[in-house]
Amino acid sequence: MELSTFVRALQRSADLVQAWGDAPIPGRPSLRELFAFEDVREWDILAADLALYRIPPALGHGRPARSRWGRQKRQLRALKSAVRHAARRCDDSDCARWPAGPVALFLGFTPYIARDILLPVVAALGAKRGLRPVILTEDSPTPAGADDATFHSVWRHWTSATRRDAQRIGRAARKAFSVLANDGTYRALIADHGRSLWPEAGEAILDLGLYARHEIARFSAVARHVVSHHRPAVMVSPDVADARTRAFTSLGAAAGIPTIEVQFGACGPEATEWRFFAADRAAVWGPQSRDVLVSHHVPDEQVVVTGSPRHDVLFGATAAEIQGFRDRFRVPAGNLAVVMGSTSSANNPDAPVLLAMKRAIFVAAAARPTLTLIVKPHPLEDVNETRALASEAVNIVFADGREDIRTYIAMCDAFVTLGSASTLDAVVLGKPTICPSFPGWRWSELFVNSGAIAVPRTVDEVASAFGELAEDGGVSILARHARARDTFLSEWVQDGGRGGTDRVIALLESAAHHAESRT
């Protein structure tokens, strides 16, 4: 299948960032070397973010480049954050709570990703002998029922020495970005086939410099402290593109600590963050995920098919739990409980298409009083914006965006999605699934092309799909897509979605044991 212009731009962006970092300059350090501050390899830490989010607008794709006022607001936020952290009192209370024995360190800086991918592994590992789990967060509250002893904060490993180290790293980063901004030899590297991308790409890089000098300097200093003072046996990251996790895995790898990347979301040719994979192993959903990562130049021998921990919690909903769910959202007896996994429009270049699809879903649902549509907002979504599209339809209710959508999928009769990772959860559970994909929407191609779900392309087709749900509860949708669903699951999911947690734990234990045997 021919790649879209958007995907080709993402791949070109990744190629450029890699080439810029490695380009030789006679008698001068390369960009990768310029941004190396002892063991802190900042170009490598920032590269995935740069290629995925910052450079595509300079190539004419991705989210629009920030206006001057937008950049100034970002600079003000960065400066406010720097002032706040400069005044932050030193706190090393979690150092004393670090467990004795070998520790598996889970990098849980994005709460909903940590909840879906890391917490199932942390909980299961905590019940075993051997590796002790520690999940490192950024002041996230401990989930109800979780073992508080396993939750640490980067800011409770914030010693006076760590603060001084962060300041040194920040000064080194400021100097490196200043050289890039003011030296014509380095600026000339920021080009595509001889065409200069300065100032467009240059402004994006320098904008990233604010983040690097403050936020990433602090995370790098804490990572250096954790690696040198506590030395975990293995590190686990759920987000290969997040510069915060990359700071930890980069410093861990430099110290000989094995690192594991656990796949979070669906990935295809657009997932160019995997071009910057630098861990020892990648734990992926299924055989097709392995093929995708290999296509992004991840060595095949470093990819392990484990299945996803997020799927283990999908199974086993009881009749009482399902009735409690229906009662909570006041679903009338006889109505179908249809859950919509909504998506944020913030910083999305296809936001107008997204809003049109949401509006079509709400209009179709409102016209079917025997359905109750339960809208589960994305954790980063502007709920007021989405709620306004639903008007005052009595059979549309909104849930708390902070809750776990997997619980909703397990309890519902049918699922409506816009292409997020939760789409696979619904397919795994065999739920009738509708995924609108209007012309111009680029974020659900994996599921759209699978044939495993219903894909209405217009407002009228969305209405027709909801009509099918109302008529037979989704039986016809499931029957029409059954064969494609079975094929899709065999390619993308290990053992029907079960056992991912145990296989990830086995991978961690093996990596830690192998590292120990080398010392």
Task: Give the positions of each predicted feature.
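Catalytic binding pocket for nucleotide-activated donors in carbohydrate/polymer assembly enzymes
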Residues: 279, 292, 297-307, 390-392, ...
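Conserved N-terminal ligand/cofactor-binding loop architecture of enzyme catalytic domains
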Residues: 1-116, 120-224, 229
